[in-house]
């Protein structure tokens, strides 16, 4: 892993924490100034100064791989460093390794809890980058993670450690097939092929099962139907969007542990038959399952869920509304223009995000018999473009 930040504080706490010894000391790359929750500082000024030393470390790590699958980037979209410098790093890695997978775990600003007032700006500018440069984005949200800890895991005061634990379970689940043997293998590229019907629509909801409160683990029977039921449960989605408000374009289920692949397939078909109205009918067989033999430590079975649902537009729509409310009055814009940004960039990011929302809406409303019409329209558009 390579850890980067524009201020030394968080790095020091990682280094002195319980896991400080597992990271190579050279892989901590940090600046001194901080980004002050300013996307422009992370992307254009402070971040741009630090990015070359980060890329050197990334290059060293990549050269150590015998078969580099891709990159996983964890960042938040509300602050300055994760959003501004995170997207800068993604675009630089994209330039250098154009054919490797780029997977991001992006923490969106929460609906009710706001850390800083300029979150909508930072998030919108980041989404603008992620649409173009990332292959797969797992959309996370602190509030949804907090709800899972509170409601399902029965933690009265969840800490960031508890929230991170959920994210790490998902990260581990997504990559387990690369790291362990399995009956039905999948990797990041297969995942992308199966989950992304249109290149721009690569923002996924993630879920994990079994989620059990610490006290009641030993009373819980782990069966494939139980895992299936829990991982499709909308309460366990790690972002503030409700899959019942949209339809699944595609989904993927990754099971871990000793189990029969036949049973997994039966359960997946069962889910699709019972909830057929929540799946678009013009993509047949749109749920992919994979099975990996080695379960996570302390569990006999586990499953990770990744869904490409049109309801993710709720997240974008919410951020976009907040963005517009501020941008209309040009609030706080001088922080960004002062770092050399142009208002035009904001306008572009805003329209890109709104386009994304309307694309999701278009495919949510599409039916099988309309598909031909869209193709005709697209051909007309292409003819016009020529």
UniProtKB/Swiss-Prot annotation:
Pfam families noted in UniProt: Tubulin, Tubulin_C
The keyword Nucleotide-binding is annotated on this UniProt entry: yes
GO cellular component, one term: cytoplasm
Assigned keywords, A-Z: Cytoplasm, Cytoskeleton, GTP-binding, Magnesium, Metal-binding, Microtubule, Nucleotide-binding
The keyword Nucleotide-binding is annotated on this UniProt entry: yes
GO biological process entries: microtubule-based process
Cell compartment(s), UniProt: Cytoplasm, Cytoskeleton
Residues annotated for GTP binding in this entry: 7, 76, 80-82, 142, 164
Necessary cofactors: Mg(2+)
Main location: cytoplasm
Positions of Mg(2+) binding: 7
Biased composition regions of type Acidic residues, renumbered to the chain: 367-386
Family matches, as InterPro entries: Beta_tubulin, Tub_FtsZ_C, Tubulin, Tubulin/FtsZ-like_C, Tubulin/FtsZ_2-layer-sand-dom, Tubulin/FtsZ_GTPase_sf, Tubulin_C, Tubulin_CS
Molecular function terms from GO: GTP binding; GTPase activity; metal ion binding; structural constituent of cytoskeleton
UniProt-annotated stretches for the region Disordered: 363-386
Family per record: Belongs to the tubulin family.
Function: Tubulin is the major constituent of microtubules, a cylinder consisting of laterally associated linear protofilaments composed of alpha- and beta-tubulin heterodimers. Microtubules grow by the addition of GTP-tubulin dimers to the microtubule end, where a stabilizing cap forms. Below the cap, tubulin dimers are in GDP-bound state, owing to GTPase activity of alpha-tubulin.
Quaternary organization: Dimer of alpha and beta chains. A typical microtubule is a hollow water-filled tube with an outer diameter of 25 nm and an inner diameter of 15 nM. Alpha-beta heterodimers associate head-to-tail to form protofilaments running lengthwise along the microtubule wall with the beta-tubulin subunit facing the microtubule plus end conferring a structural polarity. Microtubules usually have 13 protofilaments but different protofilament numbers can be found in some organisms and specialized cells.
Name this protein carries in UniProt: Tubulin beta-1 chain
Lineage: Eukaryota, Viridiplantae, Streptophyta, Embryophyta, Tracheophyta
Gene expressing this chain: TUBB1
